[in-house]
């Protein structure tokens, strides 16, 4: 666990110190004082009464001794409870389909003042240019947008075609950037465990920062070896004992509740007073519809309190201080003298009802954020341009030949989980022996002119129609599932025509589609418009059968080879437990 102060993130000049100390002593006027407020004590439990005094970006003092202190402006909290700004310990903003600018507009008013982001989605498509854009957005954001340098581009060497590489030399060029907190999730855990020098070189280069992990279901000697390499955390745990063992071995546990991967219920009972400094909250992938209707980290805190009886100070601790401490962000995570004034005022702390947000000492106005969004996005110089280098397809491209009596491998989806199971199904003249089997294909979109990789999918709930998307982790080729080759081709051609996006086809017609013009991953629409379009997509998808809650997000992970057990990449069917390609027909 990285508990050291990373001085790179705590810039304060001597003049600022003198001004801050003068206000703390009571010798100078504060910029803001928040009155009529109780501060939730994340360290001891309980509450602290009294004002919060702010000078510039920082808290100058807390407590009743400042009741009569002078200020340029006073904020009446009207009896609210103050907590530190929320921190998402691990996410890919691209998976929200929003730009970093739009994401800030959607989440900052909900109390999300800090994010630790791995932009490996856009880096897989555009390489260093994608990372550079995220850095520009982070530099101009009010929200604290920190970046982990993407470590595995592609996710697993030799297993898929992606749009770009991100070499160690390129990674090192960003290591000392003021918004960089460390090395992003090291997904090639077999390579780390076996001691591959190229991976150890990356770990060594970032060892003074935070090293993110990714090891779903890993245990035994392999888990020990992975941690021994220096990996400090994992957000992929989905079983109670798995999470407990990682904590026992010194890993910090990121409890994830995204739109597809929902692990909070399985892991929440692990959180207690003793281990909460080692526990954090993250979303990984959460779409704008859920953010608008349920919330972001605020939704996770609410569930910890209401459904899992986690004490208030512990729930808010894992949503702020624990994460700040883990990443060496010593200026964040507490409402205390000298800390950055990232403050969330709650009219109801148990329901996480956000009344007002301050970040870097300034109150946030949601309407102002919305009004400035277009100009700030333009200022960031987004990397526009068509990233889909693929000719239209026909139904014959998805033709598969099956022999009666033969057994074939089927990817079995598990609703609301990223892992899949591997099963087999026997083909007869009447079709497969289970009626949930549909077709899946992955088409590379980077000009390699490869034929589609085709396979079988079960458990997804698709009874008719087809879904296609250019969001398919982590290489972001085109993934399509369907009941007929004709409708699969129609869906694929729509997302090609759109320059990337999502599409639902049913009854031989496009029912709904969403263009994603930035890297085939993100829209430039507002969060509200995106939420409405996603609502329409989900409604159209529901007509195709009893699909997962978030069908497109879950579909996007069917091509990610670093999460078990059976996946399909542009290169073919991949066994995520043996870390090797396998055949569609079972011949063993």
UniProtKB/Swiss-Prot annotation:
The keyword Disulfide bond does not apply. Pfam families: Adenine_deam_C, Amidohydro_1. The keyword Cell membrane does not apply. Keywords: Hydrolase, Manganese. Its EC number is 3.5.4.2. One of its GO terms (biological process) is adenine catabolic process. Its cofactor is Mn(2+). GO terms for molecular function: adenine deaminase activity. It catalyses: adenine + H2O + H(+) = hypoxanthine + NH4(+). Homodimer. Belongs to the metallo-dependent hydrolases superfamily. Adenine deaminase family. This is Adenine deaminase. It comes from Escherichia coli (strain SMS-3-5 / SECEC).
